[in-house]
């Protein structure tokens, strides 16, 4: 399935708005520019596998707990990949695992994230980061105080944009993956495990 907003570069133009819990997407495309994918629900857990998401400014944004696995995240211009609004006290915000971050020729200055809300969270685990990712990696959205509350981290990323020598000082480099087992990130209180049960879930969908 392809979700596309064809409005062009006119400001916010959401292609897909997700509020419900236990949202599962596999082999889908999300096309747009600013604010392509709105992970809206504060209590929502969302899983994306082998999906393609493209945009420019804050094109993955919202309050939800979201796991991207084996996805391609493509910047079609300068901007910010994510703009999390994670609530205070939430264990996870955005988690990217084994994803590839690519950029169009005109995408030369892209940040991994900036905090839409103070307690924003985004973690990139063993992802391939293209040269369009700026050396600083993270942006504080013009508010120094966000650096004390937002949680941004990386683990064993590769690619031209993965060097940590000039990373923003408020970012973290994980030494291990304690707390980031992909089968536990979305568990919640009901034990939802789309990573393990993904194929079974797809088979149970009535067509």
Protein language model regions, located:
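Sequence-level preference for short, compositionally simple segments enriched
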Residues: 1-207
């Amino acid at each position: 399935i392809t979700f596309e907003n064809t409005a062009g570069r006119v400001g916010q133009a959401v292609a897909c708005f997700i509020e419900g819990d236990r949202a599962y997407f596999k082999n889908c495309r999300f096309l747009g520019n600013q604010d392509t994918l709105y992970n809206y629900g504060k209590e929502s857990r969302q899983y994306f596998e082998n999906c393609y998401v493209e945009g420019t400014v804050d094109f993955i944004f919202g309050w939800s707990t979201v796991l991207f696995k084996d996805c391609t995240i493509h910047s079609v211009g300068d901007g910010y990949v994510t703009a999390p609004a994670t609530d205070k006290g939430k264990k996870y915000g955005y988690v990217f695992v084994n994803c590839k971050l690519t950029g169009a020729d005109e995408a030369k200055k892209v940040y991994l994230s900036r905090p839409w809300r103070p307690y924003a969270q985004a973690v990139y685990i063993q992802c391939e980061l293209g040269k369009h990712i700026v050396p600083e990696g993270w942006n504080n959205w013009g508010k120094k105080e966000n650096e004390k509350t937002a949680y941004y981290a990386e683990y064993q990323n590769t690619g031209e944009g993965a060097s940590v020598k000039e990373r923003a000082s408020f970012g973290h480099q994980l030494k291990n993956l304690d707390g980031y087992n992909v089968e536990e990130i979305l568990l919640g209180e009901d034990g939802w495990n789309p990573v393990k049960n993904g194929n079974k879930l797809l088979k149970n969908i009535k067509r």
